[in-house]
Amino acid sequence: MSTAVAEFKPSEKLLKTRNIGISAHIDSGKTTLTERILFYTNRIHAIHEVRGKDGVGAKMDSMDLERERGITIQSAATYCQWKNHTINIIDTPGHVDFTVEVERSLRVLDSAILVLCGVAGVQSQSITVDRQMRRYNVPRVAFINKLDRTGANPFRVIEQLKEKLKHNAVPVQIPIGLENDLKGVVDLVTMKAYYFEGKDGMDIQEKEIPDDLKELANKKHEELLDAASMFSDELTEALLEGTPTEEMIKKAIRTGTIELKITPVFMGSAFKNKGVQKLLDGVLDYLASPVDVKNKALDQNNNEEMIVLESNYEKPLVCLAFKLEDGRYGQLTYVRVYQGKLSKGMTIYNMSNNKKHNVGRLCRMHSDEMEDIDSAEAGDIIALFGIDCASGDTFTDGKLKVSMESMFVPAPVISLTIEAKESKHLNNLAKALNRFTKEDPTFQTHVDPESGQTIIKGMGELHLEVYIERMKREYGVELITGAPQVAYRETITSKADFDYTHKKQTGGQGQFGRVAGYMEPIPLEETLDYDFVNKVVGGAIPREYIQSVDKGFKSCLERGSLIGFPIIGVRCVINDGAYHDVDSSDMAFQIAGRYAFRQGFNKANPQILEPIMKVEVDGPSEFQGAILGSLNQRRGMILNTTEEDAYCKTEAEVPLADMFGYSTVLRSSTQGKAEFSMEFSRYAPVPRNVAEELMKKYKVNNKDED
C-alpha cells in the first residue's frame, strides 16, 4: 500500500493525507481505539489491551509508567495507511494535568476524533478538550465508544454534545443492538447494515437494515439529509428531484465538518472490535486534508504581519517543532512541515535564536519505533535527530523570516521543593530537569535565591508525581520532596498615590531621582498582570529615565510584601518627578521606582489571591452525600449536580490549597467508585482568616529580614 501512496504527485498525496488527533476524557478508551486502528491498518499484527493480562500494554503507551498506570501521558506519534490514504495519528493524554500535550498536538493537526464514553457521555475533560479544539479551529468527528457497556445510550450522548458542547451533532450511524447485544452499525449514508464478525471483527458483512430498525434508520437518515443540505446547493436540488447520491451527501457533510458547522457522530466499541473500520472510512470521507486548512505565520520582517502558508512543496520551507523527547539516540524533535520540503543534508534555521542546523536524519515515527526517510513535504509529521531546540520553535530554510504563532501555555498552579537523596545524583537531577522543562513548557523549575532549594512547578499533583517518578526511573534519582505549595498571587484593591525621592551622596557623583504618580487595580476580566502608563509632561523626568522607572516597578512584581508571592493586576501611572543634571542616572530612577512602588502598594489595600479550581466529581448516586460533604469541607462552592441512571455528577469550585490529597479521601469515602478531575478556573481573594494565617507564617519564616 505504501508504494501506491509514494507514486502520487504531491498535490494528490496531500489530498490523501490526514493529520488527526484522538482526544477524550480519561478512560474513554481512546488508546484502545488507536490500538485497533493500527491493527486494522496492518501497522501491528496483534492486539494488546491497555491494562491487558498479557502484560504487554497498548502499542501507543511506550513509557513503562504509562503501561503501569494505564493512562497515556505523552502524545505518541504514529502513522498508518487506509484505502490509499496516509493517516498520521497523535495519541493525546486524557488526564487534565497533561493538557499541554493535548494543546501542542492540536496545534499541528488538521482534524480530530473526539472519543466519548457511551455510558458517561460528555465529561469535564471532554469539555476542556473541546475548548482546546475550538481555539485551534480543529474540525472533528465524534466517536461514541463503549456501546457494549451496561447503561450505554448513544442518543443521550448526542443530546449532551448539543447542549453542553453546543455542537451541531448529527449521527451518521445508529447501533445494531446495545450492551451485550451490540452487533454492528447502520450507515445512514449508504442505508446498509454492517456487522463486524470473525476473530477481531475483521470480517465485515454488509446486509439489509434489520426490520426493527428500519423506522428509526429512515427518520435519522432524513435528519442527516436535512443537516447536510445546508452545506450544498447541489444536494438541496437533488433532494427536491429525489436523486441524491452517496457522493453528494458525503461531500456536503465534509464541507460542513471542515467549516466546523457540523459534527458527524460515529458509534461502536473499540474493545469489542465493532465500528472501527467504518470510523476510519469517516476519517477519509469527512476530515480535513492539509490542503483544507489555513495555517498562518507571523512575518518577522514586517511587524509580525500575519501571512497564510501554502501546503505546497515548491514554496520555501516552514516547519514547527511541537514535541521533544530524549530518545535512545539523543534528542528527538517531532516536526510538522507546513510549507516546502525538508530533506536530509539540508541546512535549516531556528527562528527563535537564528541558529543554523544541518538535518542529519529524518524518521517517521511509530510510537517509540522509527523508520528512516529521505525527505518530508508540506503536510507531513516526522521526527528529526540531534536538533537542539525548544518546543514551539519555528524552522525555515532561511528564505523566509517567519514564525508560527506561539502556542497558548497555561501558567503552573502548584509547586514543590525537591532535593536529591544522595549528592552523587545531583548531575543526573540537573540533566532530568533540563530535559523535562524543554519537553513540557508547563513543567517549570527554579532555585529559590534565599533557601537555595530547587522548586518544581506544574499543573497539578499528578503532573508533578509523574515527573518525580520519571526522574527516579529514567535517571536513577531518588528525591526528597517538600509539601506542595499553592501559587498564590498578591494584588491591590484601591487606588493609592506614591511620591518618592531617592537621594544618596557618597562623595563624587551622587544618586538622585524623584518619582510621583498613582497605582490602581486592573479589573480581573482584563487579564492583564501589569500596565505602565507615562503621563509625565514638561520633562519632569527625562525620556531616557522613563524606562528606568518601569524597570524599577517591574522588579517589585516578583515578590509582594504580604507573603512574598508575585503581584498581578496593577496599573502604575507616573505623572510627576524630578531629576538632577549630574546625579540622576538609570540606577537612581530604578531605585526610586522600586521604593515608590512599595509605598503605593502598601497604601492600596493589598490582598492575597488564590487559584480556584473547577472540580468535577462523577460517582454512583448512593455516594452523593459523601461527595458533597467532601467538597464542602474543602471550602467548595457547589455549582451544579445532575443525576442520571444511578450516577451523579457534581461540579464545584474549590480552592487549590484544599485539594491536596483529595484523591485518597474520595477513594476511601466512595469505595473507589468515584473519580474526579480538576482544572484551573480563576484567581480569587482568600478569606481573611486564611490570609492572616499565611501572613503570620511568612513573617515567622522571614523574621531575619526584618
Swiss-Prot record:
An example Gene Ontology molecular-function term: translation elongation factor activity
SUPFAM superfamilies: EF-G C-terminal domain-like, P-loop containing nucleoside triphosphate hydrolases, Ribosomal protein S5 domain 2-like, Translation proteins
Subcellular location: Cytoplasm
tr-type G domain residues: 15-291
GO CC terms: cytoplasm
InterPro entries reported for this sequence: EFG_II (IPR041095), EFG_III (IPR009022), EFG_III/V (IPR035647), EFG_IV (IPR047872), EFG_V-like (IPR000640), EFTu-like_2 (IPR004161), G_TR_CS (IPR031157), P-loop_NTPase (IPR027417)
Keyword set includes rRNA-binding: no
Protein name: Elongation factor G
Organism: Leptospira borgpetersenii serovar Hardjo-bovis (strain L550)
